[in-house]
Amino acid sequence: MAVFTTVSQDEIARWLLDFNLGEVRELRGIASGIENSNFFLTTEHDGQTRQYVLTIFERLTFAQLPYYLHLMAHLAERGIRVPAPIPARDGEILRPLKGKPATIVTRLPGASQLAPDAQHCAEVGDMLARMHLAGQDYPRQQPNLRSLPWWRQTEPEILPFLDAGQRALLQQEIAHQAAFFASTDYAGLGSGPCHCDLFRDNALFEEDGSGRHRLGGFFDFYFAGNDKWLFDVAVTVNDWCIDLASGELDPARTQALLRAYHAVRPLTATEAAHWQDMLRAGALRFWVSRLWDFYLPREADMLQPHDPTHFERILRRRIGADPASAPLPWI
């Protein structure tokens, strides 16, 4: 999250007249992330203070956004702990603000767990599987917009910034993934709505009173799309289950996440066979996007672009893993 579009408390107070949320008590920009303008919003209504998240969308359009917002509502209605969009008085969950689409969602409890252990990863795996199953009857369709077609489209824009070794890595890995995506095995993998960006900072944990942490929920669904469930798992594992310095997978955390996921939605033999391919796909997706954001940035207050070398390192690790001599952690 970031702040590209600034907005005053008075402007929000006028905008909120279309909602039944009461009076604005605080509006505070959120610095993390790089896609939309996000704010913590506190209101008071009938003597009660409530907290929300206001998002102004910088890239997504009014036509694109219903997929994401209605997916969040769909999952929340089925007991998955995700932010629920708040409708205005006319029932709409998307309204213009400063000429851009904007929405208000409930604020989840807790804080991000940036140094997760195996138990945190198990909770994430369990909820991710339940989220995948809960989304099976979601009627709207939209592909993951940051998948192979986007990698190919972005490749010529970022190649000039890379050295010879990086250019070769990018071109060879896109070719590898194109062949994988065209395969019969890939076509047969289970699919449905996926988060596609489930990093440590997109989940919240709260203390349960006994010193343990309970998963408060997943948020930031604005990269979601219909994709292979295994891709969603790989993206998640590539962040939650690694040593940040080296990019290596931690076996205990990886197996905790995968086993918890498998207990809810059993993973198949075909998914096991292509686990390394999907880990590579997940690493490639974020290497490409971080290169793009780093070298072709947009202006924004509080913008904090991520270092692209992190996912380059992860991708090289995944490519270099030899399943015969050093199998990647699995269930």
Swiss-Prot record:
Name under which the protein is recorded: Homoserine kinase
Organism field: Cupriavidus necator (strain ATCC 17699 / DSM 428 / KCTC 22496 / NCIMB 10442 / H16 / Stanier 337) (Ralstonia eutropha)
Keywords attached to this entry: Amino-acid biosynthesis, ATP-binding, Kinase, Nucleotide-binding, Threonine biosynthesis, Transferase
Pathway(s) this gene product operates in, as recorded in its UniProt entry: Amino-acid biosynthesis; L-threonine biosynthesis; L-threonine from L-aspartate: step 4/5
Enzyme Commission (EC) number: 2.7.1.39
Catalytic activity: L-homoserine + ATP = O-phospho-L-homoserine + ADP + H(+)
A GO BP entry: threonine biosynthetic process
Keyword Ribosomal protein: no
Family per similarity comment: Belongs to the pseudomonas-type ThrB family.
GO MF annotation list: ATP binding; homoserine kinase activity
